[in-house]
Every structure is written in structure tokens, then in C-alpha cells.
């Protein structure tokens, strides 16, 4: 019997001589690479013959084993035929060996002698191992060889393909691996003595199988992948190789994203084949036990793990539902990818894990509770902190709606959540929310019509039906809620749901049809008999749910309108799709919102335009041409001016593409000509509008109906619908050149008479006249051969009409009082019309002159081109070049152009100013207009006249430079001071036109133009932003130093203005090298000096700095802003500069520049907010800094903190020194006053006597308190002037009794000087006894004095104009000298008190002697 075979670690290990000599090894291997091809082929044939001819166990023989080993060792070098022979021999022997295992088991039952059976089992086991080893080794070696070839040169790659094609390796590989998988699936327990196989054998197979799983190419082969999945499933499940398999699976999942789906397949197959989910459960629990923080670090692994869980939940929903609890804690982890995966898992489980209706009531109840818990988690995750998770939850809900797994009980809650997510700050969440609402509409259980009125009418009917069915005592009760009408899992029964849908589609369809606003009649709604009370209640509950859903969708319409203005293209596209779906289901407000998609046709984003065009086609273009025409003309009728421009753009595109067919055009003509019954004048006008739009791209459309346009457009129907005349004027301008000639020949004079009557007549309403006259004048200048002649006639006729009326009014005036106001309201209206007409004619005359010049130039070019071509032959080429050179030298080539330019300038100048001393017709009107506009008192009485007059004035200014210059002051006066915001707004727009036309004239008025940004009117500010944006972005105006005004508009209270300002700076940042970079320091300085709230300043700077992206600009800004510190001394500006610095993105160079500029801002570090901003910069710098830079930043931080503390200490010391200095001055003044007091005391001692006004200290005599009043009453002064206090020999004690501080010294002096009426107590020879014992704070000395002075002035008014100097009074308050003073040092206080005490004693002695 051969020795046992033991799986080696590597193939070459079989050549090593075993120590125990008790295993099979290769004793005499042959080097087949050294054999000649013929010898090698003979060698392989011999091995194959032995394997096939001899018994299966011959592979144990040493000779056969050595030869097979030799071939396997050098398998990659064998020719294809040899490879194929060897593989076939090994595979066929193993395939025959496997069925013999069953025969062994039968032999065990039949024979009594066990020894031969044991030998046979051993031989079978040995042969199985050897065949398995060699076959799997061949697979691994060949795959290794192929992989190495793929990574080498292109030539080697071609060789690989040749190898594979020559012997077709892939099918061989699949068959070999399937055979190995079969060997594991049969009963091997008899061979290995137990259900667990040999560890060495199983480990070898599993290890190599997982290695093959790492090759994506192998997994693409279905047969190979199936074999590998079977091997892994059998090993882990049947032979309990769980731990090692789980470790290998987790490694594969984390490292190879392509293997995730295949691993999930393998695990799911193992569970289904062996009805044992141990492998899946073990993997789930391993994932659940993993620390959530590990997934934060390994993002790729987290993504793969999440995908695996979702795939597993899809394949094994029931098993996953019972083990999902171990994964739920990961909802609290930081990895959003794992949370996304868990959300996906719950979605799969809700859809698939609870569909089984079998089981007892307790199991059903448990399943329902589990499902409800999962749904609650899904609802809760809609508010996840991560936008990716919120988006994924909404996607899961959409999948559940598609699979009809959302109950009606939850339907409205999900819809409400989704509608709320439409306002999410993340674009991906908004996209998912829009898709969810689209899906909910598409799969809603309430029917195809979701109009609120329909549901309300139906609901009311069934409530009445319920009241009839219920007993009388319950008739007044409310209908049950959703929960009462639902079954155990929160879903309304299918019967009731189907009934609801059928009723809503069938019986309610008639009530949903009216489109003209008719109320739904109760008679139109039939209520079918649906059964008993409970069924009726369930139906009512479902109708109420449908009503709430319809209201929820209708309430989201304003949000969808906002999303259509989003900067994200996906928002716009999906909002349009949702609106289209809403219109399909007749959601209230959807059609009105869809009208607002028209302006999006001008979007530069191609995807948005395509979405708009597709929506337009699907909504308005129908199969029936008449329906299409009716849809289009109704759209034209209801559209405003902006929408009509967009509609024209779309119609042109659709006509060019053929989407609007000729039959639709014919239907539009039928509507215009009233050939369709019931057509109104308004519909006729709408049809003509669409035809006019279509004619822009296809003018031939109008040629066949010229007479109809004149007859109907200006006929009796124009009286009914005045706008029809305006539309007809627009259509005339779209005529082709050929059609214009036809028109002039057939109906020219008639048409011009009609147009003249439109302009000069009075039959058009006031609100329509101006638009109609505009189009009529333009039409005249478009088709008339000499439009200036007709225009002259129109002006004269209009002028005579206006002033003839005035003369008639004057003739009829009899009294003096009636002459005060000649211009009646009728005359004002006519004058306004006249001014509009004459100014519009002047503008069209200017355009007409320019078009004539261009026409002459085109004709000249067209004429010169053939002559130039004929001269440019080879013979005349040299002569032509010589003539051209001579003409160029003489200037003859440019003389024609110069002549045309001169003629054009002269013609333009003659429009308003005239070419001679006498002014022309329009020039006379301009003079009158200029005087009229200066009559402010008249115009203030008639605002509508002022609007027309200023509009006309602006038009004349645009035409003529000299007229513009002479009236600029007037225009800016009106734009600043006019009470009407309409006038100011129009003039603001005109300033933009003037700046384009005459930039040099407007340049000195730049500041005044920027001032319009501060206007109180919203429309004026908005127009100012638009005008300035246009001028600056098109390089028509220099930014100058007023751009900060635009920056302030970023924080405007009106969102529209704020958005326009932001858009301006966004577009400005795209120009050149971003001008905002250069403007930012100036804007910062200007905003710092303005009275702008700190929050507004921060928002403005944050937005502006956010538009600067380049690192070099950021680095330069660091230096610029640091240098601004040295130029300002205000703490507020320091704070603003430092805040702006903190908004910058700091690179390594930026940090270094900040550190190098320390001297520039060190003086500002005393401010706490400045220091905080620098600390913010430091904290940001630490996050990205390298170790070397981080050390510098930390050192810089210490320096900042140190200087901040030093500056704070210096400020404190300076304040204390100032206090001390003021205290010293006060004490010195006390000493001087005491010395002054000594002189009168000494004179008294010599016998001069006591002054009548002198008093003794109140503390020495009790009767002294009332002395002042007594003496002042007895001896009043006759002097008119206030006596100097020095004459009274006393001082004002309240000035000497205070604690002083230098903090507010400057502020106090004016306050003292203002007390002119305050009496000096020295005048009466007394002091204020109340002030003698008062202790006051030195910080508020002056404030206290001023308060006392004010109170004294109220009590004792004085006629004195001058306040006496207290220093001249010869007395002080004795008690005040012993008070404590603040801010002084102890030694100085003692010296001062000693000095003061001697004077006190002298005063006391003098008082006692008296």
C-alpha cells in the first residue's frame, strides 16, 4: 500500500525527502523542459496511457506520481496538446473515482472482513487527494501564468490570446473546478472517518478557491463562478469550515469591490442548497460586531460591506430580517456609507421579507411589529445628518412605492416627508425627493385624477351615504380615521382600495371634467352602492387619504417654482418632470406652474433647454392639429411679455424642426379668420400671435394671408379686442421683402392711413395705446419707402390735435378762475400721447438712419466685390496691387467710409438739434419738452404726464449728445428727487442707455448713478443693480471707488436685489484674473467706514472672499490686508480687517506671510476680537500644516497670546497713570487754594475786620447751617453782574470735595462751560453744606458736578453770564480735604493730607476768633 499523500505548502515541497518517510513525495522528477518536443510528446502520451489504462489508483505508484508531478511542475511550458492530454487524463480519472465512493459504502455492508475495505478506503482517499491536488495546482499555475502575461508587453498579451485560443482554457478550467466541487458534495464521511474532512485537504481547496475569487476575469465565466460558489458553500456549510471561510470572505469584501456580488451569491446558494444559514448569519454578526469607527477609516471597505449587506438582503430577506438587529446599532456610527447600506437593507426587507401569509397569529403579529419598526427607522432616517443617507432613504421609499409596498396609512406621511425634502440644502437630496414624488404619483392608489374639488365632492357624497346607512343616534359622529379603516399592517383592504379607485375613475370622472371653473354639482356625482357601513367607512377613509395626498402635492407647487430657478441643472430638470406628472394627474396649480418653465428656454445649459422643449412638446403638441392650435393660442393669450419672448423662441425652434406641422399652421389661420365656430376675438389675436412667432423662422407663412391680416387685424374686431391691432402691427414687421412689395402695391395707402389713425386717434384705451403706437411707428419705419414724410405728418396732426383742444378750452373759458389750470385730465392724456409718439418717432428715425448707412455699405461691398474679383486675375494682379497701394497712400480707399460717417453724424444731429439756426419739427418739440420737464410744480400735479415727459426727454437725450449734455443735471435732479418711484425707476434705466451711448458725458456722474442703489424704492434699487451690472460686466463703465455700494446690496432686505448683487459679483469674478481680488481691500475699507451692522459686514465679506479661488491671490491678500492695519487707528476697523483675514484660505506661504507681517498688526492685538480672529486663523492652519510649519504656527500662537496680554497690561497701566495724574493735579489745586486762603486770614489778625459775606465752618457752630440764607436775605446785591468769587473770600466747596479722575476730563469742560446760568455760591458768601460730606467716585467727578450745577441752577437762578473761578475764592471745605482719592500712591496721599491739615487748622483758628 502506498504511503499517504499530504498536501504540501507549495508544489516544490513534494521534492523534499520526508523525515518520517511516511508520505508520498516525488523521488525522481523529470526535467521536461530539457526534453525535445517529440520526446516530450511521447512522455506525455505515456503518462496519459498509464492513467487511462491502469486502475484509478495507479497515481499512487511512485513512477506515475513522479511523472505526473514533473508535468504539473512545468505545465506552463507544455505545448497546448500536451496540456490538454494531461488535464483530460487527470479529470477523467477523478470523475470515475467519485462514484466509487458509493460502491465502497455498499461493500462495507456486504463483506465481513474489514481489512480489504480499509485498504480500499485508504487508496480512494489517497487518490482523491492526489487528483484534487494536481488538478487545482494546474488551474492555479495556468491562471498565474496568464496574469503575468497580461501585465507584460503587448506582444506577450497577444501570445496569451494565442495560448488560450489554441486549447480553449476557459471551458477546461470550469470543468475541472466543477469536478472538485462535485467531490465535496458527495458523501466523503466514509473516506475521512467523520463528517469533518481532513483539515489540510479542505484548507488547500478553500484557500485556492478564494484566491481565484480575487480575479475579476475568472468571475465573469459563469461555469467557473458557479463551481467556486459551490466549493465555498460546501466547505463552510457542509463541512463546518466557518471561521476560516468567514475571515476569507471578509477579506475579499473589504479589498475587492467586484467580488461583492459573487460572494453574496455564494453565501445565498449555500443557504438554499443546505437549508443552513450559518455562514450568512456568521458574516452578518461579524459585520455587526465590527467597531463603527473602523468603517470611518476604511471608506472603500465600508462601501463594499454595505453593498454586500444589500445584496444579501435581496437574496435572503427572511434570514436577514431575523438577524438585522445586530446591524441596527451601526445607525449611530459615523460612516454614512454603512448607514446608506442599512437603509437599503431595510428597504429590501420591507419589500420581500414579510409577504408570507402563512403562520399562526402570534408569528404574524411579530412580523407586523418588525415591519413597522423598520418603517419607522426609514422615516426617521429622512432626517439623517448626512445628505447621502437622506438621499438614499428617499430612493428606498421610491423603490417601495414602485413595488407597491407602501401602505395607504403611510402614504401621506411619506409624501409629506418627501415634499419637505424639496427644500433640503443638498442637491442630491432634492433630486431624490423629486424622483420619489414622481414615483408616488405614478403608482398612487387613488386614481388618475387627483383634483381637490373632485375628492371633496366625492367624499361629501359618501359621507351623506354613510349617515343614511348608520343608525340615527350615530348620524352626527365623524367618520373614522385612517387607522380604524385599515387592517393590521396599516393597509386598507384591497377590496376597499379597488372600490375607491374604480369609483374615482368611473363615477367621478364627469365631476372632474369642467375646465372653466364650473362648480361640481351634486347631481353629476352618482354614488354606487358599495355595501355595508364598514365598507363605506373604509372607502371614506381611503378618499380622505387621497384628498390629503392631493393637497400635499398641490402645496408643493410654490417650492417647485423655486427649484426651477435653482443653479443646479438636476433640480430644474426633475422639477419639470414632476410638474409634467402633476399636470397628467390634474394636480391643482400644476398647469400654472408649468407656464413658468418658458423662460428656462433661454438657459445656456443644453440639458435644461432640452427638458423645457420636451415638456412643451408633451404638453401642448397634440395629434389633432386643431387641439394643438387651441393649446398654443391659449398659451399666447395668457402669457406675459417675458413668457411671450420665451414662447417665441420655442415656437421658432419647433417650426424649424417640424414639430409644429403645416396642418397646425392652417388651424391657426382658421382661428384667426374666425373659420371655426365659437372663435372669439381674443382667440383670433392669440392665433395671430403664434403665427407671428412662427414667421420669424418661416416668413412664407404670412404671404398667403396679407389681406386677411389687414382686414381682420385693423377691422371691426380690433374695436372688440384692441390688442389685435398691436399684434397685426407686429406681424407686418415680419413680412418678407417680397410680401412687403405686394402689400405696398395692393393696400399700401390704406394701411398707412390705418396706422396713422392708430397713432393720432383717440379710440384706443389708455392702457393699450402706448404699446400699439410703439408697434405702429415701428411698422411704418419698417415698410414705408420714405417713413420720415409720414412721420412728419403724424407729428403735426398730433400736435394740432393737442393744442387745438387747448384753444377751444380757452375760448370757452369765461371767468378768471377757470384759467388757472388749463390742462384738464383729457388734455394731459393727449399731451402724454403726443410726447410718447414724437419721442418714439425720433428714436425710430435714428435707427432708420443707421440702417440706411448699413444698407449703403452693403450695397457698396456687393458692388465692389465682382469688380475686385475680375481685376484679381494673374495679368492684372500686379497692377491691382499697385493701384490699391496708391489709393491707400492718398487715402482714397477710406474717403467713402468717412463721407458716410459724416453724413450719418449730420443726419443724427438734425433729428433734435437741427443743422442750421432754425430747428426742425422734432427739435422744436425737444425745446418745449425740456421746459416742460423743468416745471416741477406742474408735473407734480400730474404724475402720469411727468412719466411720459421724462421718458420722452430721455429718448431725445439718447439721440443727441448736445441735448443730453444740457439736460443731464435735470435728469439727475429728477432721478433723485421725483416723488414718483415709477419716474425714478424709468430714469434709472435710461441712465444705463445714456452711459452706453455717451460714456464720456456720463463719466462725471458715476457717483450719482451708484447713489441709486440707496434709493428707498425697491424697483429703483433693482433697476440700478441691473443697469450697473450690465455696464460693468460689459466694460462700459469703470468700477472706480463706488463698488462697495454694490457690495452692500448683497445684504439688501429684498431677496431679489440681494440675488442680483450676488449674481453680479459671481459674474465679475469670472472676468480676467478676478477683479474682486483687486477691489476687495478698497471694499473692506469703505465698508468699515460705513454704518453697517457687523453681521451684514461679515456676510458681505464672506461672500466676496468666497469668490476668490486662486492660492496666489489669497497669499497676496494676506499681505495687503496685513498692511492695512498700519493705516487705521480705529478698533472697529482692526476687527473687520482681522475677520476678513480669518476668511481667507491659508496656504503654507500665506501662513508665513502672516507671521512675517507681525509688526503691521501687533498694535491691534490689544483688542479681544482681533486676537480671537487670529486664533481662528491659527486653528485652521494647524489642520493642514506639516510638522515643520505646525511648530512655527504654535510659536506664532504663543507670540500672539503674549503680545495680547502685554498690550492689555499696557492699557491698564496707562489708565492708572492717567487717573493718578489727574488726582495729582487736583491735590495741587487744593494746595494752591489753601495758600490763597491764608492771606485774608493774616490781614484779619492785624485788625482789618471780617468780611460780611464770610461764614464759619458749619461743623464748628451749630447755628452756621442757616447763616447763608439769613445774610443773603438781609443784604441782597444791587449789582447786575455776577461778582467774582474772590471778592467774597470764599470758595465753591463742591469742586474741592470730589475724587477726581482724568478719564473724562475733556468731556467735562464743555459741560461746565454750558452752565452759564448757574449761580456761584461765593457770590453770597456761602458754600453748599450738602456737598461737604459727600463721597464720590473719581471716575464720575465731572458728571456729578454737572448734575449738582444743574440742580443748583434750578433752585437759584442767576442773572450772571460768567461763572467765577473757584480758585479765586479764599476758602475750602475742611471735611473734603480728608477724603480718600483714587489712583494715587500711599506716600503721596500722606504728604498731601499733611499739607492740607495745616491750612485746615489755620482756617479753624480764624473761624474761632471770629
UniProtKB/Swiss-Prot annotation:
Signal peptide: none annotated. Residues 469-492, 504-525, 860-879, 1208-1410 are annotated as: Disordered. Induction: Regulated in a cell cycle-dependent manner with an increase during G2 phase, highest levels in the middle of G2 and a drop during mitosis. Its main location: nucleus. It is found in: Chromosome; Nucleus. The keyword Nuclease does not apply. Pfam families: Cnd1, Cnd1_N. GO terms for cellular component: chromosome; nucleus. It comes from the Eukaryota. Keywords: Cell cycle, Cell division, Chromosome, DNA condensation, Mitosis, Nucleus. Belongs to the CND1 (condensin subunit 1) family. This is Condensin-1 complex subunit CAP-D2.
Amino acid at each position: 500500500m502506498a504511503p499517504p499523500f499530504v498536501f504540501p505548502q507549495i508544489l516544490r515541497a513534494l521534492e523534499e525527502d520526508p523525515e518520517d518517510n511516511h508520505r508520498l513525495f516525488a523521488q525522481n522528477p523529470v526535467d521536461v523542459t530539457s526534453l525535445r518536443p517529440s520526446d516530450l510528446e511521447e512522455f506525455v502520451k505515456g503518462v496519459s496511457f498509464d492513467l487511462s489504462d491502469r486502475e484509478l489508483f495507479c497515481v499512487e505508484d511512485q513512477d506515475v506520481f513522479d511523472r505526473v508531478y514533473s508535468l504539473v511542475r512545468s505545465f506552463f511550458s507544455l505545448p497546448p496538446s500536451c496540456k490538454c492530454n494531461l488535464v483530460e487524463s487527470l479529470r477523467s480519472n477523478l470523475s470515475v473515482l467519485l462514484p466509487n465512493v458509493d460502491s465502497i459504502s455498499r461493500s462495507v455492508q456486504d463483506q465481513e472482513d474489514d481489512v480489504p475495505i480499509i485498504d480500499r478506503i485508504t487508496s480512494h482517499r489517497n487518490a482523491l487527494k492526489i487528483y484534487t491536488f494536481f488538478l487545482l495546482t494546474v488551474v492555479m499555475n495556468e491562471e498565474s501564468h496568464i496574469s503575468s502575461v497580461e501585465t507584460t508587453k503587448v506582444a506577450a498579451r497577444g501570445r496569451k490570446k494565442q495560448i488560450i485560443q489554441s486549447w480553449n482554457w476557459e471551458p477546461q478550467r470550469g470543468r475541472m473546478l466543477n469536478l472538485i466541487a462535485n467531490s465535496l458534495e458527495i458523501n466523503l464521511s466514509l473516506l475521512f472517518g467523520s463528517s469533518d474532512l481532513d483539515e489540510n485537504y479542505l484548507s488547500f481547496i478553500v484557500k485556492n478557491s478564494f484566491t481565484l475569487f480575487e480575479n475579476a476575469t475568472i468571475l465573469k465565466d459563469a461555469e467557473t463562478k458557479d463551481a467556486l460558489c459551490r466549493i465555498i458553500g460546501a466547505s463552510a456549510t457542509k463541512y463546518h469550515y466557518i471561521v476560516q471561510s468567514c475571515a476569507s470572505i471578509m477579506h475579499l469584501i473589504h479589498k475587492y469591490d467586484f467580488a461583492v456580488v459573487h460572494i453574496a451569491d455564494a453565501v445565498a446558494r449555500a443557504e438554499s442548497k443546505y437549508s443552513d444559514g450559518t455562514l450568512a448569519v456568521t458574516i452578518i454578526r461579524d459585520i455587526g460586531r465590527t467597531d463603527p469607527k473602523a468603517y470611518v477609516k476604511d471608506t472603500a471597505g465600508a462601501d463594499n460591506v454595505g453593498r454586500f449587506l444589500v445584496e444579501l438582503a435581496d437574496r435572503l430577506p427572511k434570514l436577514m430580517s431575523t438577524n438585522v438587529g445586530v446591524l441596527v446599532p451601526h445607525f449611530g456610527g459615523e460612516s454614512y456609507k454603512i448607514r446608506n447600506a442599512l437603509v437599503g437593507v431595510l428597504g429590501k426587507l420591507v419589500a420581500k421579507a414579510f409577504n408570507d401569509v402563512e403562520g399562526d397569529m402570534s408569528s404574524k403579529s411579530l412580523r407586523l411589529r418588525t415591519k413597522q419598526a423598520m418603517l419607522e427607522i426609514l422615516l426617521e432616517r429622512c432626517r439623517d445628518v448626512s445628505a447621502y443617507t437622506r438621499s438614499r432613504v428617499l430612493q428606498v421609499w421610491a423603490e417601495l412605492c414602485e413595488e407597491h409596498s407602501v401602505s395607504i396609512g403611510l402614504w401621506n406621511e411619506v409624501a409629506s416627508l418627501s415634499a419637505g425634502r424639496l427644500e433640503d440644502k443638498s442637491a442630491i437630496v432634492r433630486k431624490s425627493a423629486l424622483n420619489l414624488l414622481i414615483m408616488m404619483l405614478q403608482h398612487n392608489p387613488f386614481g388618475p385624477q387627483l383634483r381637490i374639488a373632485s375628492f371633496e365632492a366625492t367624499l361629501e357624497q359618501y359621507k351623506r351615504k354613510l349617515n343614511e346607512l348608520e343608525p340615527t343616534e350615530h348620524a352626527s359622529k365623524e367618520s373614522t380615521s385612517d387607522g380604524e379603516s385599515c387592517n393590521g399592517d396599516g393597509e386598507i383592504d384591497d377590496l376597499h382600495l379597488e372600490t375607491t379607485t374604480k369609483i374615482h375613475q368611473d363615477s367621478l370622472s364627469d365631476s372632474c371634467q369642467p375646465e372653466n371653473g364650473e362648480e361640481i354639482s351634486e347631481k353629476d356625482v352618482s354614488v354606487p352602492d358599495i355595501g355595508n357601513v364598514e365598507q363605506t367607512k373604509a372607502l371614506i377613509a381611503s378618499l380622505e387619504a387621497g384628498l390629503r395626498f392631493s393637497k400635499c402635492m398641490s402645496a408643493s407647487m410654490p417650492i417647485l417654482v423655486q427649484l426651477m430657478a435653482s443653479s443646479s441643472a438636476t433640480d430644474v430638470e426633475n422639477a419639470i418632470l414632476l410638474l409634467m406628472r402633476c399636470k397628467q394627474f390634474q394636480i391643482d396649480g400644476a398647469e400654472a406652474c408649468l407656464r413658468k418653465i418658458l423662460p428656462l428656454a433661454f438657459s445656456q445649459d443644453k440639458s435644461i433647454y432640452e427638458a423645457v422643449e420636451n415638456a412643451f412638446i408633451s404638453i401642448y403638441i397634440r395629434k389633432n392639429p386643431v387641439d394643438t392650435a387651441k393649446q398654443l393660442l391659449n398659451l399666447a393669450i395668457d402669457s406675459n411679455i417675458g413668457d411671450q419672448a420665451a414662447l417665441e423662441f420655442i415656437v421658432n425652434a419647433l417650426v424649424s424642426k417640424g414639430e409644429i406641422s403645416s396642418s397646425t399652421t392652417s388651424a391657426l389661420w382658421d382661428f384667426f379668420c374666425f373659420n371655426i365656430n365659437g372663435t372669439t376675438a381674443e382667440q383670433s389675436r392669440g392665433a395671430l400671435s403664434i403665427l407671428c412667432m412662427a414667421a420669424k423662422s418661416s416668413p412664407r407663412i404670412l404671404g398667403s394671408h396679407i389681406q386677411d391680416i389687414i382686414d381682420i387685424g385693423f377691422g371691426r374686431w380690433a374695436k372688440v379686442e384692441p390688442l389685435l391691432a398691436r399684434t397685426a402691427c407686429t406681424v407686418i414687421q415680419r413680412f418678407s421683402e417680397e410680401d412687403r412689395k405686394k402689400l405696398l402695391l395692393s393696400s399700401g395707402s390704406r394701411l398707412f392711413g390705418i396706422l396713422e389713425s392708430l397713432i393720432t386717434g383717440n379710440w384706443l384705451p389708455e392702457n393699450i395705446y402706448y404699446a400699439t403706437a410703439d408697434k405702429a411707428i415701428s411698422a411704418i419705419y419698417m415698410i414705408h419707402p420714405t417713413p420720415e414724410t409720414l412721420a412728419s405728418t403724424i407729428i403735426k396732426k398730433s400736435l394740432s390735435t393737442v393744442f387745438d383742444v387747448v384753444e377751444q378750452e380757452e375760448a370757452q373759458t369765461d371767468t378768471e378762475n377757470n384759467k388757472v389750470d388749463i390742462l384738464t385730465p383729457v388734455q394731459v392724456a393727449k399731451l402724454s400721447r403726443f410726447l410718447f409718439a414724437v419721442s418714439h418717432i425720433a428714436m425710430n428715425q435714428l435707427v432708420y438712419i443707421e440702417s440706411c448707412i448699413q444698407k449703403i455699405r452693403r450695397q457698396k461691398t456687393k458692388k465692389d466685390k465682382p469688380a475686385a474679383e475680375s481685376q484679381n486675375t494673374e495679368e492684372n494682379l500686379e497692377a491691382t496691387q499697385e493701384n490699391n497701394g496708391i489709393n491707400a497712400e492718398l487715402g482714397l480707399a477710406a474717403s467713402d467710409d468717412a463721407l458716410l460717417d459724416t453724413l450719418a453724424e449730420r443726419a443724427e444731429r438734425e433729428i433734435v438739434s437741427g443743422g442750421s439756426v432754425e430747428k426742425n419739427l422734432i427739435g422744436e418739440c425737444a425745446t418745449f419738452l425740456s421746459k416742460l420737464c423743468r416745471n416741477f410744480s406742474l408735473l407734480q400735479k400730474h404724475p402720469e404726464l411727468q412719466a411720459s415727459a421724462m421718458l420722452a426727454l430721455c429718448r431725445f437725450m439718447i439721440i443727441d449728445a448736445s441735448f443730453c449734455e444740457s439736460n443731464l443735471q435735470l435728469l439727475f435732479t429728477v432721478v433723485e428727487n421725483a416723488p414718483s418711484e415709477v419716474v425714478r425707476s424709468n430714469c434709472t434705466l435710461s441712465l444705463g442707455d445714456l452711459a452706453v451711448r455717451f460714456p464720456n458725458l456720463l463719466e462725471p456722474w458715476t457717483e450719482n448713478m451708484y447713489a441709486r442703489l440707496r434709493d428707498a424704492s425697491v424697483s429703483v434699487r433693482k433697476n440700478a443693480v441691473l443697469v450697473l451690472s450690465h455696464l460693468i460686466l460689459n466694460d462700459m463703465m469703470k468700477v472706480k471707488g463706488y463698488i462697495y455700494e454694490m457690495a452692500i446690496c448683497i445684504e439688501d432686505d429684498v431677496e431679489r436685489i440681494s440675488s442680483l448683487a450676488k449674481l453680479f459679483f459671481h459674474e465679475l469674478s469670472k472676468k480676467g484674473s478676478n477683479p474682486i481680488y483687486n477691489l476687495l481691500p478698497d471694499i473692506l475699507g469703505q465698508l468699515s467706514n460705513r454704518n453697517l451692522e457687523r453681521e451684514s459686514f461679515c456676510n458681505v465679506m464672506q461672500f466676496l472672499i468666497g469668490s476668490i479661488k486662486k492660492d496666489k491671490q489669497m497669499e497676496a491678500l494676506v499681505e495687503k490686508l496685513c498692511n492695512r492695519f498700519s493705516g487705521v487707528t480705529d478698533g472697529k476697523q482692526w476687527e473687520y480687517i482681522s475677520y476678513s483675514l480669518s476668511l481667507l484660505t491659508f496656504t503654507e506661504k500665506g501662513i508665513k506671510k502672516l507671521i512675517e507681517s507681525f509688526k503691521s498688526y501687533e498694535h491691534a492685538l490689544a483688542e479681544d476680537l482681533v486676537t480671537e480672529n487670529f486664533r481662528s486663523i491659527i486653528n485652521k492652519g494647524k489642520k493642514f500644516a506639516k510638522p515643520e510649519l505646525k511648530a512655527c504656527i504654535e510659536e506664532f500662537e504663543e507670540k500672539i497670546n503674549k503680545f495680547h496680554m502685554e498690550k492689555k497690561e499696557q492699557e491698564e497701566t496707562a489708565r492708572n497713570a492717567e487717573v493718578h495724574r489727574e488726582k495729582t493735579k487736583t491735590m495741587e489745586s487744593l494746595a494752591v487754594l489753601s495758600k490763597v486762603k491764608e492771606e485774608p486770614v493774616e490781614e484779619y489778625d492785624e485788625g482789618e475786620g471780617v468780611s460780611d459775606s464770610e461764614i464759619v465752618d458749619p461743623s464748628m457752630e451749630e447755628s452756621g447751617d442757616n447763616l447763608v440764607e439769613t445774610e443773603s436775605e438781609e443784604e441782597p446785591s444791587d449789582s447786575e453782574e455776577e461778582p467774582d468769587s474772590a471778592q467774597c473770600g470764599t470758595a465753591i466747596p463742591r469742586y474741592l470735595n470730589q475724587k477726581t479722575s482724568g478719564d473724562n476730563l475733556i468731556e467735562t469742560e464743555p459741560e461746565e462751560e454750558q452752565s452759564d446760568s448757574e449761580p456761584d455760591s461765593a457770590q453770597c458768601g456761602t458754600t453748599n453744606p450738602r456737598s461737604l460730606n459727600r463721597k464720590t467716585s473719581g471716575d464720575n467727578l465731572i458728571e456729578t458736578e454737572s448734575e449738582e450745577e444743574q440742580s443748583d441752577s434750578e433752585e437759584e437762578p442767576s442773572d450772571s453770564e460768567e461763572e467765577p473761578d473757584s480758585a479765586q475764592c479764599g476758602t475750602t471745605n475742611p471735611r473734603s480735604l480728608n477724603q480718600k482719592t483714587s489712583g494715587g500712591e500711599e506716600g503721596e496721599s500722606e504728604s498731601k493730607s499733611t499739607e492740607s491739615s495745616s491750612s485746615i487748622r489755620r482756617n479753624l483758628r480764624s473761624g474761632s476768633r471770629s
